[in-house]
């Protein structure tokens, strides 16, 4: 009679952690940081259709790395939670903290109860009416929450990117300066520009967005096209092009097809 295979709970959880970390390590990095007028999201993402940065609610944004189909499901679930809570109670009850708690419960339950953990790491950011009330929450695959005071880095080269970010980041930077700091940090950890190479990531390989403190109603705005290029070069964009880029509503990502590529 053969003995059944046995693995201790500790070993099972270690194996799940290693599996999730390996999946996340293959994804390109994302930087989320506070700047003078709100919160800035910058991701290395050459795709124009698969977004790693999105809007959740009026003043709440979402960024993620890992397996796209998994964090896209989390994003859509977060939107449903925020809409229902805001409708049944009050929009002021929808906060970054409440959303982060829901995500933590979901990630933790899947990690402990399912065979396969989610290969994702996410950040929930909320812009306050004053800088002191801006909040950043980073959540890992096992449901752990870390409240970041100034910035958060996720992805395969998070350590290298975070080190570069700490060297240049200052609190209260204007948008253009904060964007260049984030891009420089991402470039230091990128496989395409790192390893001592001086090149910076180009606008075509970046996804950027902001939560603007003084923007009425919906604080989320994507930075792209000539507006993004001008910010990277710190030059004023053509007025018509800048207005077009800034005035577009955030893209509706809800109907994107699932994709298992690591993002």
UniProtKB/Swiss-Prot annotation:
InterPro entries: Ntn_hydrolases_N, Proteasome_alpha, Proteasome_alpha-type, Proteasome_asu_bac, Proteasome_sua/b. It is found in: Cytoplasm. Pfam families: Proteasome (PF00227). Its main location: cytoplasm. One of its GO terms (cellular component) is proteasome core complex, alpha-subunit complex. Keywords: Cytoplasm, Proteasome. Pathway: Protein degradation; proteasomal Pup-dependent pathway. Residues 229-263 are annotated as: Disordered. Transmembrane segments: none annotated. Gene3D superfamilies: Glutamine Phosphoribosylpyrophosphate, subunit 1, domain 1. The formation of the proteasomal ATPase ARC-20S proteasome complex, likely via the docking of the C-termini of ARC into the intersubunit pockets in the alpha-rings, may trigger opening of the gate for substrate entry. Interconversion between the open-gate and close-gate conformations leads to a dynamic regulation of the 20S proteasome proteolysis activity. One of its GO terms (molecular function) is threonine-type endopeptidase activity. It comes from the Bacteria. GO terms for biological process: modification-dependent protein catabolic process; proteasomal protein catabolic process. Belongs to the peptidase T1A family. The 20S proteasome core is composed of 14 alpha and 14 beta subunits that assemble into four stacked heptameric rings, resulting in a barrel-shaped structure. The two inner rings, each composed of seven catalytic beta subunits, are sandwiched by two outer rings, each composed of seven alpha subunits. The catalytic chamber with the active sites is on the inside of the barrel. Has a gated structure, the ends of the cylinder being occluded by the N-termini of the alpha-subunits. Is capped by the proteasome-associated ATPase, ARC. HAMAP family: Proteasome_A_B (MF_00289_B). Component of the proteasome core, a large protease complex with broad specificity involved in protein degradation. NCBIfam families: 20S_bact_alpha. This is Proteasome subunit alpha.
